[in-house]
Amino acid sequence: KIEGVKIINSPFWTVNPEFCDNVTIKGITIDNAPSPNTDGVNPESCRNVHISDCHISVGDDCITIKSGRDAQARRLGVPCENITITNCTMLSGHGGVVIGSEMSGSVRKVTISNCVFDGTDRGIRIKSTRGRGGVVEDIRVSNVVMSNIKQEAVVLNLKYSKMPAEPKSERTPIFRNVHISGMTVTDVKTPIKMVGLEEAPISDIVLRDIHIQGGKQKCIFENCERITMDDVIVNGEEIKM
C-alpha cells in the first residue's frame, strides 16, 4: 500500500509495481518534469490493483497499465487484471489513463470512473501494434470529465508503430469489449479515434452518453466491428455508425 505521499521530479516511471497482488495506491501526488518516460503510476502484470484519489502531472503517461512486451511476455503469460482507477485527477501528460503498448501478457477487467483529465495530450488511450500479441478486454470507463485535450479524447490504436502486414497469429494483438459511458469533453482536437488491424478489427465497443464540444476533426473508425452508439453528441450532432 502506498498512501498520502508526494513524489516530484522522477526521471523515469515513478510508481511501477510488477507481478504484484492486492495493491492499493491512494491519495498520492506525482509532479514530474515534462520529460519523456516520466510516467506516473504503471502497474505491470499485477492483479487486484486499486488506484484512487491521486493527483498526477507528468511528462509522459499519467497512469499506464502494462503486461510486458512481445515473445517473452507471451511466454510468461501474466496479465494485468482487476484494476480499478477512481477519483483521480490527471493534468499534463501524453495520456490520462493508458493501456499498452506493452500488453503482450494481456490486460483485462479494468474499471475507470469519476476521473478528471485537464490538459493531457489524450484522455483514454489503448495502444498496441503487430508483434505484441495479447488481448485487451473488458474495459469499463464511466463518469469522466475532460478539458483542454490536445489530441484525442478516446483513442484505441492497433497501429501504434508502423509494422508490415502479417497473417493473424499469436503475434496479433486484440482489443475487444470496451464500454465507455457518461463522458463529457470540452476543447479537444479529435473526439474519438479507433484504428484496428485488417486481420484483427477492434470489436464489441459500446459508447453511450458521451458529449463532446470543440472537436476540430471528425471521429475516426477504421477496421472496427460491432460498435454500438447511444447518445454520442459531438458539437451538437449525434454520431451514428
Task: Please name every model-derived segment.
Residues K1-M241:
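Extracellular/periplasmic carbohydrate-active domains that bind, remodel
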